[in-house]
From Swiss-Prot:
This is Mucin-22. The chain crosses the membrane at residues 1661-1681. Residues 153-1514 are annotated as: 124 X 10 AA approximate repeats. Residues 248-258, 547-572, 1466-1485, 1615-1639 have a biased composition (Polar residues). One of its GO terms (cellular component) is membrane. Residues 27-1660 are extracellular. Residues 1-26 form the signal peptide. Residues 1682-1773 are cytoplasmic. Expressed in lung by serous cells of the submucosal gland (at protein level). Detected in the placenta, lung and testis. Pfam families: Epiglycanin_C (PF14654). It comes from Homo sapiens (Human). Residues 61-102, 176-357, 372-405, 434-572, 590-674, 754-1026, 1064-1485, 1603-1639 are annotated as: Disordered. It is a single-pass membrane protein. Induction: Up-regulated by poly(I:C).
């Protein structure tokens, strides 16, 4: 009853109240609806914005980042924008972004707070830039005021999507920042890699930077937006943005492809890539927008220079195109330079910077690769490229003979195809196994070698060396790995360098190149296609194509291969022929003509392929040996194989060998008419200059074939060389491929003199001719040593190379220098003798110088092609490369570069690593620079550069390996190195090198990846990937390691063994080749085999085997070990590692018991610790030579080191020096005991014995030393190694002591400085420590080790992982790496800084660790992404990575980017595939992504794979994200639409006004504005946000909010994630943030319009209260106040107690009225609640409470308007 009574009165009151309240709320309600509906519209985009806000909250949460991963980045962008907004806020805000930004700001802060902090900082600045951009937008915004225009603006927003770029722009502005970032780069550098990524974005950024201007432009774009230019920009942006980034991704990739398609268009594409650059270019078109961008250009002026860089990229463009980012990288490199600058010397590197430019090129290589997004393209290309690489891989595989390896390797199927060809090539080559026959011939070789007699021993060693030389075919390293592959392989390379055995792998590579040849064969078929395509790849690769080209030239080789194929076939037949090359040996004389052929080179390739036949060819190589001789010294190197690092050096020369491989091209040379092309080749050089046109060159590449033709002419020369061979072979000049080089010379090398040198070489050749007498060659080899001395002079040449650096300048002259190198060439010719290789190693140095100059050349790298021309010296290498140049020509000269890179590897290293090296080389320079003298060395450098080369070789490898990846790879590189360890094994593995190559291969796989390595991006990207792959590489390596080594070896071993059988005979050849390789591979086993090899081989290969064993131990123990020790020494702990390395050696030797030995080595390690002092000693070691003498005693100390024996072993050779020490020998004995340990190594002992013979071999090692001398040069790299080498050199003296090694000592002096470098290397040791750390990394690689082990197992596979385990002690692989590190040390030095830089990568290493798991890491790569995340810390790491970046930065910062991105990419890598798309996209993503990833996004990066999906969308998403941000902006537009809907709401002008006024902000801010309603209450504002959940009924204003809220809600619905979920967050968490929003309240200013009504409400409140009182009075009067009141009173109270009806009813009324249920609900509650209280008090309180609370609630815990406006108590309550 009462209730009923009350109800009437009550209802009356309610009705009255509603009547009072209803209207405005009513309107609101409608409004809300309209708004709501609109909201829905808003929801989509708005939500995004809102979402962004919410996300922002989330973003703050960080999950947002994840959530917004894309959006995040979007948000990040927005966030950045937000930050910008924060900065710019107004303008940014103006876009709905503000709303987001408000939140975003908080988020940004928060977000930034994330890893983004650094990044954020960058991003921040980036943001700031963006902010500026936004400001532009703001202006636009104003324009935007017009809803429609605003919509246009939305287009602008789209433009903003451009701003995606804007986001990127932010990043881009980052670039601007980056420009600022120039310093930023430092920061960026730190962030660098991140930034670099950004840089990548940078080119993007650059573009962005341009975009910075872009931003300006964007501002302009703003106007442009207004202009709709935005629209254009929008599309531009979209295109650019999405397309841009996407284009970048796609474009780069696409354009990359395009690039590939039209080198010219590539330029255009470059434009597209430009969009990569093109982003810039697109920016360029953006620039068109860039007209504004024009200012951009202006802005970019720095960027302009950036652009210039881009321009550099120009030619770069193709390169740049990819390089674009590369440029970016280069820019990054620029900043890279900055980074390089970071690198400091890096900057020097920057000079290397030009290196960077080179890097750009390399970068291009990388970037290309990176861009390889085209990477992908390349990758695709690479795919075939990979195939190529794979081929390289398979090549390795092939090398593995692995032919089956090939089969196994390929798998490398596409490779297989290549592989098949390669396979056959391999097989053929491997068949070169029958080459064994050749080895038989090698036997004759031996016979020849016999003439080589001891040479035979040496030669045998050489022979195997030759095999090694073949291996030395780092040849592969040269181009093959070279792509960056070499770099990478090189990485594995330098690891491989150790890999040099790696190069051995390279040999595999050579095989590779052989394969390449084969591959080319494959690609040959593919070749033109590939070549063309390769060229594309080349284009893409830029250098990559270089690599690819190399592969391309490979193609050229392929062309060569064509004939190569013929050769390959020839190789096959070659095998047969070479095989016949057995007679080939006789043919070797013929091969001499082979040399003439260079066919010898050709067969060289064949020989290289043959390399096994090399042995045969070796006989063939005879000239091959000449080359082989180079290989010979290579062989020496092979002996050096211990030096194998030396070999690496040799590999450097190996590269020369590679050059030879290039000669392989020369084989192409066979192209005869191809010769005519030669002129072209000369032109090619021009083409090389064309390098930019690289693509053109790629075309040229086709002409490359022409080049090959040139090579052909080379052939002609060769042909002349033909008979020349003998005569020409004196043309050894042919080896003087110099003739090629000569041709190359024609290129520049007109080495001609080189030929003359070749004449020298000729003598070399003569030796070569002697090569027939190979023995003579051997003698020459001796002279080879002399040549080595020449190499020493090589060092001198290296000095020249140093000059080389000068030469670098000279490099053109480099060619000339190369001519100087001429001696270089002579050396190069010697390369023919292998001294050339050594010289080449020297020249490699030269090449390195070239590589260094390569840096220059690299700079030249565009000229890289030119370099290739320059490579001329490169050509020397190139010479060999000459055809390489030809290839290089084809390669652009890139191949040349690549070949050169081979030395070119150095180049490539430089180039491939070139970039990296450039970075490394750069850092190499940096590292070298870090090496300081390294840089100096670099200059020396070049001399050292040889080191650099070696270093770069290593560096190259490291660099390449590090490139960062290599570093990572370095880790895995280590693994690879391990593999390299196995490298020795790898040498076998060489087959496994195939593994290594394979690793290289996988390296190749990485290579393949490397192929993608060719993708280089892969390298860079895969580089990371490579690293990852390295990881997996390792795994692969492991697999491969085992695969190649075991498998390969086993298989190839089988094959090898098979060959091994004949290998026995073949084994000699193969053994050394495979055996050496194989032995190197199984080294122990092969060593054992080698042992048997020795036994079997021993007979023939015997010494060969010994050499092989030596090679095995040699590689492992002596040289490597020595330098390794030095490295180890350098490594100090590295030593430990070195010890491990020792075991590595030991491992190699015993390797198993060696492990014991390794254990001993462990004590070795202790000794090594001593070795640590050894390091000192090592330093002394540098003087070590002298010291070595001293070292002798030192060595005695070393003797302690003796246990260092490894050192001793190496030391053994060291001992050899020591041997000079004699006691050292005793020490060696100690080493002997070490050896004994080694003996324990048993086989090691045997090896040791061999090692002894090693000593002998070491003597060979001596020649090894010579090689080492070369290694000396290598040693220079070895520097530590050098000193080690020096020691070895001493060993050189050891051997001959004779060797110019003495001069080697001089070289050593250079080495000394190298030692200084070594000292640097010492720091290298630090680095080595880093390397050690690398070891750690390797340890990290632990699994890496495992991987390393795997690599180890690679070694392990090869050797007893035990030692491997010891080796696994990471160092094993590390040791290997260390060995590599030895040279690696140089590399480590390079790597050191590289490592250091890379090492910074250590986290990278971590990545490497990841890499360790890397295989997993590939997944781990995801973790890599984690690493990337680590990269996030990477960002921190990146800071470190920054240095990494520095390295990476240079490394492509790309690499870093790749690394960062790389790991990022790894994420990207995961993204990798992402990368493929993402490469651009990924990097794009990385770019944008980096921002995103920059923060968490890295995690997101993990998502990035998702992002990958996103990536496509990512790109889109990112773009979208950006556009998402843009979209948000667009959304804003949507908001605008919403606003328009608001307009529907606008029907309710009030809303409309706020909406319009609010604009984007409008909706939300409108909500905020309603908040404004409670002026001064930011919380209220927050509340408003909060309100959203509650669908508050704010009168119209709130309604608007509600609307907004609803919209949000809808948005949420749409957004699902965002708004609502975020809301609370926004409200609660972000509340402060919202306060910022409150700050953003500016919108609130808009809001006030809405406020108006709210004000009305306030009026109503009073009215209501008054009305209530009035009503009460009225009711009382009407009903009888008392009675009714009582009735009401109790009922109310009861209602309060149990009266749900009123509550429900009131609620119902609320709903009916459409009022915020909360309000009445609260009211109802209040009444109910108040019901307990007195009506007056209760009502008041309750009502006040309820309403106040309700409203308050609506507003958020305002506690009310009531509190503020009504009863303190009620409100307060």
């Amino acid at each position: 009853m009462r209730r009923g009574n009350i109800s009437p009165a009550f209802w009356f009151l309610w009705l009255l109240l509603f009547g009072l309240l209803g209207p405005s709320s009513e309107n609101t309600t409608a409004f809300t609806k309209g708004s709501d509906t609109t909201t829905a519209s808003i929801t989509g985009s708005e939500t995004t914005m809102a979402s962004t806000m919410a996300s922002t909250s989330a973003l703050t949460t960080g999950s947002k980042i994840t959530t917004d991963s894309t959006t995040g980045s979007e948000t990040t962008s927005a966030s950045t924008m937000a930050s910008t907004a924060a900065f710019t806020t107004g303008s940014e805000t103006n876009t709905a972004s503000t709303t987001d930004s408000g939140t975003t700001i908080a988020s940004t802060r928060t977000f930034t707070t994330g890893s983004d902090t650094t990044t954020g900082s960058t991003a921040g600045s980036e943001t700031i830039v963006a902010s500026t951009t936004v400001s532009g937008t703001t202006t636009t915004f104003t324009i935007a005021s017009t809803t429609v225009p605003e919509t246009t603006m939305a287009s602008s927003t789209t433009s903003t999507a451009g701003s995606e770029k804007t986001m990127a722009s932010s990043i881009i502005s980052e670039t601007t920042m980056a420009s600022t970032t120039g310093s930023e780069t430092a920061t960026v550098s730190t962030t660098g890699s991140e930034t670099t990524t950004t840089s990548t974005a940078s080119s993007e950024a650059t573009k962005v930077s341009t975009t910075g201007s872009e931003t300006t432009t964007a501002s302009t774009a703003g106007s442009e937006t207004t202009t709709t230019s935005t629209s254009m920009a929008g599309s531009e942006a979209t295109t650019t943005s999405t397309a841009d980034s996407k284009v970048i991704t796609a474009s780069s990739m696409s354009s990359e492809t395009t690039v590939a398609p039209a080198a010219g268009s590539n330029t255009t594409t470059a434009s597209t890539t430009g969009s990569e650059t093109t982003t810039i270019l697109i920016k360029a078109s953006e620039t068109t927008t860039a007209s504004t961008a024009g200012s951009e250009t202006t802005t970019p002026s720095p960027t302009g220079s950036q652009t210039t860089i881009v321009s550099i990229s120009g030619s770069e463009i193709t390169t740049t195109s990819t390089a674009g980012s590369e440029n970016t990288t280069v820019s990054s490199a620029g900043s890279g330079t900055t980074t390089a600058s970071m690198a400091g010397s890096e900057t020097t590197v920057s000079t290397a910077g030009s290196e960077t430019t080179t890097v750009s090129i390399t970068g291009t290589e990388t970037t290309m690769v990176s861009a390889m997004g085209s990477e992908t393209t390349t990758n695709s290309t690479t795919s075939s490229e990979t195939t190529v690489t794979s081929t390289a891989g398979s090549e390795t595989t092939t090398v593995s003979t692995v032919g089956s390896e090939t089969t196994t390797a390929y798998t490398a199927d596409s490779e297989t195809t290549a592989a098949s060809t390669t396979g056959s090539e391999m097989t053929t080559v491997f068949t070169a196994g029958s080459e064994t026959i050749t080895p038989s011939t090698a036997g004759s070789e031996t016979t020849t070698v016999s003439t080589a007699g001891s040479e035979t021993t040496t030669v045998s060693t050489t022979g195997s060396e030759t095999t090694t030389a073949s291996t030395a075919h780092s040849e592969t390293t040269a181009a093959s790995t070279m792509g960056s592959e070499t770099t990478k392989v090189s990485t594995a390379g330098s690891e491989t360098t150790v890999s040099t055995a790696g190069s051995e792998t390279t040999a595999a590579s050579t095989e590779d190149s052989e394969t390449n040849t084969a591959f080319t064969e494959d690609s040959k078929t593919t070749t033109a296609s590939t070549t063309g395509f390769e060229t594309t790849a080349a284009s893409t690769t830029g250098s990559e194509p270089t690599m690819a080209s190399t592969m391309g030239s490979e193609t050229t080789m392929a062309s060569t291969i064509g004939p190569e194929t013929t050769k390959v076939s020839t190789a096959s037949s070659e095998v047969t022929t070479v095989f016949a090359a057995g007679s080939e040996t006789i043919r070797a004389s013929t091969v001499g003509s082979e040399t003439t052929t260079v066919s010898t080179t050709g067969s060289e390739t064949t020989t290289a392929s043959i390399m096994g036949s090399e042995t045969s060819t070796d006989s063939t190589t005879g000239s091959e040996t000449t080359t082989a001789s180079t290989e010979g010294s290579e062989t020496t190197t092979a002996s050096t194989e211990g030096s194998e690092a030396t070999t690496v050096s040799t590999t450097g020369s190996e590269t020369t060998t590679v050059s030879i491989t290039d000669s392989e091209t020369t084989t192409t040379c066979t192209e005869g008419s191809e010769m005519t092309a030669v002129s072209t080749t000369v032109f090619e050089t021009t083409t090389a200059s064309t390098e930019g046109s690289e693509i053109t060159i790629a075309s040229t590449s086709d002409s490359e074939t022409t080049t090959a033709s040139t090579e052909g002419s080379e052939t002609t020369t060769v042909t002349t060389a033909g008979s020349e061979t003998k005569t020409a072979y004196t043309t050894g000049s042919e080896t003087t491929t110099a003739s090629n080089t000569g041709l190359e010379t024609t290129t520049v090398f007109t080495i001609g003199s080189d030929t003359t040198t070749a004449s020298t070489e000729g003598s070399e050749t003569t030796a070569v001719s002697a090569t027939g007498s190979e023995m003579t060659t051997v003698s020459t080899e001796g002279s080879e040593n002399t040549t080595v001395s020449t190499t020493g002079s090589e060092t001198t040449t290296v000095s020249t190379t140093g000059l080389e650096t000068t030469t670098t300048s000279t490099e053109g002259s480099e060619m000339t220098t190369v001519s100087t190198t001429g001696a270089e060439t002579t050396t190069d010719s010697t390369e023919g003798s292998g001294t050339t290789a050594a010289s080449t190693a020297g020249s490699e140095t030269t090449t390195v110088s070239t590589a260094d100059s390569e840096n220059t050349t690299a700079s030249t790298a565009d000229s890289e092609t030119t370099s290739a021309s320059t490579t001329g010296s490169e050509t020397t290498t190139a010479s060999t490369t000459s055809s390489e140049t030809t290839t290089a020509s084809t390669e652009g000269s890139e191949t040349t570069t690549v070949s050169t890179t081979d030395s070119e590897t150095t180049m490539v290293s430089t180039t491939g690593s070139e970039r990296t090296i450039t970075s490394t080389e750069g850092s190499e320079t940096t590292t070298v620079s870090a090496t300081g003298s390294e840089t100096t060395v670099s200059t020396e450098g070049s001399g050292t550069t040889t080191v650099s080369i070696t270093g770069s070789e290593t560096t190259k490898v490291s660099t390449t390996g590090s490139e960062t990846t290599t570093t990572s790879t370095e880790g895995s590189e280590i693994t690879t190195a391990s593999i390299t360890g196995s490298e020795t094994t790898t040498a076998s593995t060489e087959g496994s090198e195939t593994t290594t190559a394979s690793t290289e291969g996988s390296e190749t796989t990485s290579a393949s990846t490397t192929g993608s390595e060719t993708t280089t991006a892969s390298t860079t990207s895969s580089e990371t990937t490579m690293a990852s792959i390295m990881g997996s590489e390792t795994t692969m390596a492991s697999t491969i390691g085992s695969e190649t080594t075991k498998v390969s070896t086993a298989s190839s071993k089988m094959t090898t063994v098979f060959t091994e059988n004949s290998e026995t005979t073949i084994a000699s050849t193969t053994a050394s080749e495979t055996t050496t390789v194989s032995t190197a591979g199984s080294e122990t086993i092969p060593a054992s085999t080698a042992g048997s090899e020795t036994t079997t081989t021993t007979s023939t290969e015997g010494s060969e085997t010994t050499t092989a064993s030596t090679e095995g131990s040699e590689t492992t123990t002596a040289s490597t070990e020595s330098s390794e020790t030095t490295t180890a020494t350098t490594i100090g702990s590295e030593t430990t590692t070195a010890s491990t390395e020792g075991s590595e050696t030991t491992t190699t030797s015993t390797e198993g018991s060696e492990t014991t030995t390794a254990s001993t080595e462990g004590s070795e390690i202790t000794t090594v610790s001593t070795t640590g002092s050894e390091t000192t000693t090592a330093s002394t070691e540098g003087s070590e030579t002298t010291t070595a003498s001293t070292e002798g005693s030192e060595l005695t100390t070393v003797s302690t080191t003796g246990s260092e024996t490894i050192t001793v072993s190496a030391e053994g050779s060291e001992t050899t020096t020591v041997t000079t020490m004699g006691s050292e020998t005793t020490t060696a004995s100690t080493a002997g005991s070490e050896t004994t340990t080694v003996s324990t190594a048993g086989s090691e002992t045997t090896t040791a014995s061999i090692e002894g013979s090693e000593t002998t071999t070491v003597s060979s090692t001596g020649s090894e030393t010579t090689t080492v001398s070369t290694t000396g040069t290598e040693t220079t790299i070895t520097s530590t190694e050098g000193s080690e080498t020096t020691t070895v050199t001493t060993a050189g003296s050891e051997t001959t002591a004779v060797y110019t090694t003495g001069s080697e000592t001089t070289t050593t002096s250079t080495e000394g400085s190298e030692t200084t470098t070594v000292s640097t290397t010492g720091s290298e040791t630090t680095t080595a420590s880093t390397a050690d750390l690398e070891t750690t990394t390797v340890s990290t690689s632990g699994s890496g080790t495992t991987t390393a082990s795997t690599a180890g197992s690679e070694t392990t596979t090869v050797y007893i992982t035990g030692s491997k385990t010891t080796t696994a002690s990471t160092e094993g692989s590390e040791a290997t790496t260390v060995s590599t590190t030895s040279s690696e040390t140089t590399t480590a030095s390079t790597t050191g800084s590289e490592m250091t830089t890379v090492f910074t990568t250590v986290s990278e290493t971590t990545t490497v660790s990841t890499i360790g798991s890397e295989a997993t890491t590939s997944s781990a790569a995801g973790s890599e992404a984690t690493t990337t995340s680590t990269e996030g810390s990477e960002t921190t790491t990146a800071s470190t990575a920054g240095s990494e970046t520095t390295t990476a930065s240079t490394a492509g910062s790309e690499t870093t980017t790749a690394s960062t991105s790389g790991s990022e990419t790894n994420t990207a890598c995961t993204t990798g595939s992402e990368t493929s798309t993402p490469s651009s996209a990924g990097s794009e993503t990385n770019t944008a992504f980096i921002i995103g990833s920059e923060s968490t996004i890295a995690s997101t990066a993990s998502l990035e794979p998702t992002a990958t999906s996103l990536t496509g969308s990512e790109t889109t998403t990112v773009s979208i994200t950006a556009s998402g941000a843009t979209a948000a902006s667009t959304t804003v537009s949507s908001t605008t639409f919403v606003l328009t809907k608001a307009t529907d709401v606008s029907i309710q002008p009030i809303t409309n006004t706020p909406m319009s006024g609010t604009r984007t902000t409008g909706t939300r801010l409108t909500a905020s504005s309603s908040v404004t309603m409670a002026p001064g209450m930011d919380f209220t504002a927050s509340a408003a946000s909060h309100t959203v959940p509650g669908i508050v009924l704010n009168t119209s204003g709130l309604g608007t909010s509600t609307m907004g809220a609803s919209s949000t809600t809808s948005a949420h619905g749409v957004r699902t994630t965002t708004g609502s979920t975020r809301e609370p967050t926004s409200s609660t968490f972000q509340e402060t943030g919202p306060v910022s929003m409150g700050t953003n309240t500016v919108s609130m200013s808009h809001t006030p319009t809405n406020v108006i009504k709210p004000s009305g409400y306030l009026q109503p409140w009073a009215i209501i209260l008054i009305s209530l009182a009035a009503v009460v009075a009225a009711v009382g009067l009407s009903v009888g106040l008392s009675f009714c009141l009582r009735n009401l009173f109790f009922p109310l109270r009861y209602c309060g107690i149990y009266y749900p009806h009123g509550h429900s009813h009131s609620l119902g009324l609320d709903l009916n009225l459409g009022l915020g249920s909360g309000t009445f609900h609260s009211l109802g509650n209040a009444l109910v609640h108040g019901g307990e209280l007195e009506m007056g008090h209760g009502g008041t309180h309750g009502f006040g409470y309820g309403v106040g609370h309700g409203l308050s609630h609506i507003h958020g815990d305002g506690y009310g308007v009531n509190h503020g406006g009504h009863y303190g108590h009620g409100g307060g309550h």
